[in-house]
């Protein structure tokens, strides 16, 4: 199985496809504008995920789940961005919105928490991306 990691920022979105062992097999990135609104950003994110999965030469069925790192205050239980100044999001049900395009388990947390978890699981590996 493979996993999709998504990093949402105020000016862009980055996506990585990783193996069970943590090896990155594909990456993608796009620029975004917060002025477009969350609906457009989610649609662009879904397209980027689909394109990156295709670039990895795997099928959507090979993807186990999607994890999203997002700046701001996050309700990880509801899959909602409570408030993100960078993105101009307020009470955005991000996981539910993305699920309209991609039917996979989707998880979200604050981007700093995601970075800390990545560092922890890499245990000081100098090649962490």
PLM regions and their residue ranges:
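Short, hydrophobic/aromatic-rich segments at coil-to-beta transitions
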Residues: 1-2, 129
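Short glycine-rich, Thr/Ser-proximal phosphate-binding strand/loop in the N-terminal lobe
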Residues: 2-47, 80-83
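Glycine-rich His-Gly loop
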Residues: 8, 71-72
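Short, basic and Ser/Thr-rich N-terminal targeting/leader segments
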Residues: 9-11, 62-64, 110
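Short loop/turn microsegments at loop-to-beta-strand junctions
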Residues: 13, 69-70
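Phosphate-binding/catalytic loop of phosphoryl-transfer enzymes
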Residues: 20, 65-67, 73-129
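N-terminal, well-ordered alpha-helical segments
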Residues: 43-50, 92, 96
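Phosphate/pyrophosphate-binding loops at sites that engage ATP/ADP/AMP, CoA/4′-phosphopantetheine
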Residues: 45-66, 105-106, 124
